[in-house]
């Protein structure tokens, strides 16, 4: 099964595509989709949509996984922008007829590390170990996206 994990954001969206085959996890592709604050909102959302659409077309995932939205009540604009980025990512998945699932951060940490209150560093180390990376990706957004994909495989026992 090929799984696309996406860590949405308006500025840097991380993604990771992995493949579970015969009990092993293989890295297919990972990286980031970047936008700049110099672009207007519509342009940034279009960039995220088109890059996600191309990623799906190039890697042919069976499913897409996103983290359930969490934003602090003191920062409603963050939740608003995150929701917009997630919306265009969902749209790309829907138009490609790919199911999209979500997991909360605690569920992801529990699947990857074995405890829901694991630190970000613990998750990063386990992600790197699970797919045989010698060093961590430059962006934590990539590691988070890979964690989403790996967690889905573990949770569904692919």
What residue ranges belong to the model's regions?
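Phosphate- and other anionic-substrate recognition elements at nucleic-acid/protein interfaces
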Residues: 1-158
């Amino acid at each position: 099964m090929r799984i696309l994990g996406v860590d949405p954001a308006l500025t840097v969206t991380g993604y990771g595509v992995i493949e579970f085959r015969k009990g092993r996890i293989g890295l297919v592709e990972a990286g980031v989709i970047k936008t700049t604050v110099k672009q207007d909102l519509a342009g940034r959302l279009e960039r995220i949509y088109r890059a996600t659409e191309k990623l799906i077309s190039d890697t042919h995932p069976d499913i897409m996984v996103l983290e359930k939205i969490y934003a602090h009540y003191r920062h409603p604009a963050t939740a608003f922008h995150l929701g917009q980025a997630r919306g265009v990512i969902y749209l790309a998945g829907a138009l490609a007829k790919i199911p999209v699932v979500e997991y909360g951060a605690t569920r992801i940490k529990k699947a990857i590390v074995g405890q829901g209150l694991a630190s970000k560093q613990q998750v990063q180390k386990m992600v790197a170990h699970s797919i045989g990376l010698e060093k961590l990706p430059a962006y934590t957004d990539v590691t988070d996206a890979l964690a989403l994909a790996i967690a889905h495989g573990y949770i569904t026992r692919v």
